[in-house]
Amino acid sequence: MFDNLSERLERSFKILKGEGKITEINVAETLKDVRRALLDADVNYKVAKTFTDTVKQKALGQNVLTAVKPSQLMVKIVHDELATLMGSESVDLKLEHRPSVILMAGLNGAGKTTLAGKLALFLKTKKNRRPLLAACDTYRPAAIEQLRVLAEQIKVPIFMNLEEKDPVKIALAAIQEAKAKSYDTVIVDTAGRLAIDEALMNEIAAVKAATSPDETLFVVDAMTGQDAVNTAKEFNSRLDFDGVVLTKLDGDTRGGAALSIRAVVDKPIKFVGTGEKMEALDVFHPDRMADRILGMGDIISLVERAQEQYDEAEARKLQRKIQKNQFDFNDFLAQLQQIKKMGNIKDLAAMIPGVGKAIKDVDVDDSALLGVEAIILSMTPYERRHPEVLNASRKTRIAKGSGKTVQDVNRLLKQFDQTRKMMKMVSGNGLRQMMSRMPGMPGMPKA
């Protein structure tokens, strides 16, 4: 995410490395490079110029403490201004009515239908709401079927009328359905449209007028950069939407849309799509995004994702098993499945400060976890509980059953054994024993 921009900004800050103090000359040189980096990232020209002018003004107006290096100060100012540029703080959905209505709008191919499903799951699992999906794309039958499949997958009800061709009537009927069945939120999925298509723009304006939505969200593909910003401007002039959702942000190496859209249309980015999984929808936090752009990671979001998958009762049960040295492949599989639910591995690793840069050019393949799962699921229940019984013939059978090699099975067994030993070491008094064996620690045996 934003890898190219992060790399360019890091190079820009190096101009100030070795400088004893901030001067107008070295600030101008640094910010010239920063502006070029922003423009290459497809940031709006006026936004880039205003941004660097503000940073320059703040940098030259600072009394730098002797303990603070000029490059460190510049990073701090750029970080704060990036967060301000993207909106300073997250903005919640305002869902005041019952049922509340959320209207989705955007171009064809922006990911509105998938986003509608993700948002329904988000509201259901994280906001304890009872959403109803309304299929109002009357031009593309495949969109209705796609929404139906997603609704079934996330176990959320859907309202659709294949005979009706007027999206206004479908949306109003969905709201009546929600009232009758006590659903508190209606998510209206509409057809994609171009801002220059007068008939379709009039149509969605009519849907908005008829349904009086609590939230109108403009859904846009982050990877389209400046085009996303220009389209947002056109849609906003017609719809006066309440917020933006950037989809496919995990594939955006530049960041032009995320950095420009708030300043150009004066509407907040409320959510970002960060992957193909239905859980891959995050509330947009400008300060955390600024952290990631500057290579500082995003520990808070990482912890939040982990907490969402955390089950206190299961954790206590696992701790007892570890202390009794009973950690088995069933537990190992459960831990892997929790990690998978948190998101793709490369994205999770990038949230750890310094790691994102280190693995930028490394191909991290999430399908490797599927191979591990296949091996474990090819074991019998007894073998999962008692991996010590896995002899050569059993390993051969497991390899054939999982489509892997015996070497793959042996590699997993070795990793499992190391994991079990480490878990045993850090549970109870094991941590103290492990520390005592480290060089320089009390209890370290002398040579």
Question: Model-found features: residue ranges?
Answer:
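Primarily NTPase-proximal linker/entry elements flanking Walker-type ATP/GTP-binding cores
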Residues: 8-136, 143-164, 170-190
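Residue-level signature of catalytic and energy-coupling elements of molecular machines
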Residues: 16, 42, 78, 107, ...
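Short, small-residue-enriched loops and turns at beta-alpha junctions
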Residues: 110, 138-141, 165-167, 192-196, ...
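Alpha-helical transmembrane segments of polytopic integral membrane proteins
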Residues: 184, 188, 197, 342-345
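Long amphipathic alpha-helical segments used for membrane anchoring, targeting, substrate engagement
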Residues: 2-19, 288-447
